[in-house]
Amino acid sequence: IRNTPKKDNRVVFIGNSITEGWDWHYPEYFKKKGYINRGISGQTTPQMLVRFRSDVIDLKPDVVVILAGINDIAENTGPSSIKTITDNIISMSQLAISNNIKVIISSIIPARDFPWRPAIDPRYKILKANSILRSYALKNNLVYLDYFSKMHDGNNGLIKQYGIDSVHPN
């Protein structure tokens, strides 16, 4: 894909297992649309920021969709503050903008708990991070894709029928 010539209206999706899973479940959808999936399971925002140039900018897309932050909150690579999470997502968006790539920032999807980290309650951090990301997007005239408000169960967890577990939507 890195050597693929630029197609009209190309969109890159960058994220974690949630993004990666879209390609598993709907591979033809991505191929038909010319979408490029750059989701890597388990990744945190610092890891995505490191690969942002090669996985997004070098592909010269028209649009990037950023869905990130849940694995930071799950402490996959150690504790992470809300500021660090949102700063990394904002840095990715600034890199895209400086390369004339339109940015769509996705909310962090609701989660009540993490099957792999049962001691962590992510709900407060998700709400706070989403508030910061929404404000940043609005202030900078970016699209904010609000999955959270449509997918939470009233207790800030993922609606059961929307997920294969408490984190990953189906």
Regions found by a protein language model. Name each.
Residues 1-65:
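Serine-esterase "nucleophile elbow" of acetyl-processing enzymes
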Residues 17-21, 41-45, 70-75, 109-113, ...:
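Solvent-exposed loop/turn segments at secondary-structure junctions
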Residues 42-50, 79-89:
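Glycine-rich anion/phosphate-binding loops
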Residues 51-55, 85-92, 122-125, 129-133:
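A general structural detector for well-ordered alpha-helical segments in enzyme core domains, enriched
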Residues 67-73, 92-126, 151:
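Active-site segments of SGNH/GDSL-like serine hydrolases
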Residues 82-106, 134-142:
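Charged, glycine-enriched surface loops/patches
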Residues 109-170:
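Catalytic His-Asp segment of secreted/periplasmic serine-dependent ester chemistry enzymes
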